[in-house]
Amino acid sequence: MTTDGLRKKIKRYFTEIDAQIQTWEDLVVNIVQGTGDIDLDQLREELEVPDTDWFRYNREAHALTPGIVEAIIHAEERNHDRWVGETRYTFPTLIPNYDGPEHEVILRIVFDSEYHVRLLQAIPDFTEARSVIGLDAHPTMPKWKANTLSSIEKNQIINSDDNHKWRRNQRNLTIVQVGDNKNTWTKKDFSDPKVRILCDELRHKYENGFRTGITAKRFTKDLQQHLTNAGVDSPDTLYFGNEKSVEDFDSEQAGLVAGCISPSSDHIKDWIALLDKDAKPKRDVEDSYQGQKWVGEDADVAEELLADIRENGVLQACGRYARSPQQPDDGAIVYVLTNVLPDEYADKQVDDVSVFGKKEMQILDYVLSHDGVTPNRIDQETDASRKHVHDTLNKCRDYSWLHVDENAGEYNADVFYADRRPDGLVEV
């Protein structure tokens, strides 16, 4: 529910019950600024739940609105200029002739000093549950604590090592980490050359076995274009955030996860406030620091909340290629262009994509256009230096597209041939 949507619902509710105030702003400004203009105890006594017909037939009505207002009245200030309110609320059942048990929830709301709703939760009544089992789509423990009740004992029954063994051995998924950079592409810095080269090389190796990829939502069209340019007729992509429990790629031979995304500091601050923890971004206390580390007594909680979106988003993306245990003879390999995964999750690590410069492409284009050339001939017939020629050829000589006849040329020089000229190097 957006701030604007909640504002309209609260205004309509206040009008219906003829409250002493009439708007969302009247309420939250009093709480945030502490003006004391409103008697909150009196307002709490005025709160009532309208009859069910009002909820059924009023477009701006919502069954949780009375409880949300009560939670706001209970709000207290927390870290990062957030206010957190909570209440237990029994909401009206709108099903005609309903004769079942009451529906009770714990409502929690987080709003900031600008009067914007940051988080809004309706926690189910778990009192009759003997256990609640959470799947690995949301594995971070602080989020589980925030999304349930403090009275529920929480345990992680599968550790990350066991989880990876299950992915690799039972679901036949191999993960290859490419390079050692995070490649966080939430808003900018999508590495077009590296992604383009990786798509080209994967397509060349796996042919029709490579047709898909996953990246940040902002760059799905870029990834689709790179896949198309690599020869994929109808590329299929997913983006971080819509990949959970989607099995669209479970029959693919090879896949690409390009980069990762990270939550904003404000997003993590919302959860830190909700959990009543003490942590702040390191860059808030050190002007020269540009990373995403957190400091404070509960910095570890903030780091887990960061991992909930960054690391686990990449893991979920990789998992879209995993096979079911009913496919024991089939498997997939996923190339991950980010270093955010725990070391134990990468079955193999290869060097980062190396993008050729103009001189390197000139040298290799010359090799490709001639039927066997020596380094000396390249040096003589291009404007590349002798050292640049030798460095480029030595850099590429172990790749399958470059062939070398050792000592086959004049003065026992090596003779080089090329099947093609890629835009860069990567081991796939």
Where on the chain are the PLM-derived regions?
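ASCE RecA-like P-loop NTPase motor cores
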Residues: 1-428
